[in-house]
Amino acid sequence: MEGKSLLFKEFAGLDSFPIVLDTQDTEEIIAAIKAIAPTFGGINLEDISAPRCFEIEDRLKAELNIPVMHDDQHGTAVVVLAGLINALKIVEKTLSNVKIVISGPGAAGTAVAKLLSLAGAKNIVLLDSK
């Protein structure tokens, strides 16, 4: 988490620091973040597994007046989209004319599929072992 704070400072000029919670209870996480939110300009959630991550992020976005992002979902999706766009340039293809397969549509895979679709991907397949 400290490393993520360094990246925020280095690449975006944002001052940040990690706050680690010793709970996996959805209500406790939401209450703790809501209590400290007025002192922050944004909240970056990290290492919250699905399906809890969806409810926590959605509720915090609805209840707070600052940006809330679950990095495991959206940070991963942005990196995948950037890499895919650059790879497709090399092979002279576009998102709209390739087949994309995502193995394991958990929190990150689901967010990747949503972002790729918004970016113009037309043929996305999600595979799950269950």
Regions inferred by a protein language model and the residue ranges of each:
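Short, acidic/small-residue loops that bind anionic groups at enzyme active sites
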Residues: 63-77
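N-terminal ligand-binding/catalytic initiation module
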Residues: 1-66
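Glycine-rich phosphate/diphosphate-binding loop of Rossmann-like nucleotide-binding domains
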Residues: 1-12, 78-130
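Active-site-adjacent beta-strand anchor residues
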Residues: 19, 46, 70, 102-103, ...
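A glycine-rich helix N-cap at a beta->alpha junction
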Residues: 38-39, 45, 68-69, 116, ...
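Gly/Ser/Thr-rich loops at beta-strand to alpha-helix junctions
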Residues: 46-53, 74-75, 105-110
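A short acidic, often aromatic-flanked loop/helix-cap motif at beta-alpha or helix-coil junctions
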Residues: 24-27, 74-78
